[in-house]
Amino acid sequence: MSNITEKAAALLKEGTVKMIIGYEMGTERPRPFFCHTAEECEKLIMNAECKNNLAVYLTKKEIIGEDKIAVIGNYYVVKTIIQLYRENQINLDNLMVMTADENGEVISFDTIEAMKEYTDTHEPAPNPKVLAALEKIDKMSREERWTYWKNELSKCIRCYACRAACPLCYCNRCITEVNCPQWIEPWSAPLSNMEWQINRVMHMSGRCVGCGECAAACPLDLPIGL
């Protein structure tokens, strides 16, 4: 057993937590895994390919109840939990937060300060493709940027996969679902697409942790994570 599976199995056997949210190997890549028994812990993995932001589940009432749970996530999971705590969306008394280093050693966080220290000293290297895209956009004039985004966002089919994947999009009712009054048309159209994405970006300003889940979820590969 790895350090992760041993730690997870012990937590469930001792009754410290009722559920562990982590990663298991899927058909082609790691995927989220909800572990309820010590035996299931054998499936838990943690490596550089574990990219899903598991914090997205921590605000779901249908998943999170009164029982204490644990989450074993990557850097961005820890960073998101810090933000959710700041916004009073999670109760750390009912949550155990863990990650693992490059050697597979489990790192447990007892306080929000410990999480902050970890994220301050373990920030991943920037994605070269993202840096190249940002550099390209930075060189554009204001008019060129508007044309670029108008063309890109006109392809949006309004599936809202970006919203569903984002751990900081937790409103009970999104503005696109409000129809009295209707601020943004919910269907795909050039103007409403732009309104939706501008609204999404404004709501994420100063809050986004840079996990890239929105762009990863987009079926059209739109550069909405920039």
What function would you assign to each model-found segment?
Residues 1-155, 164-167, 172:
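Iron-sulfur-associated redox domains of electron-transfer enzymes in respiratory
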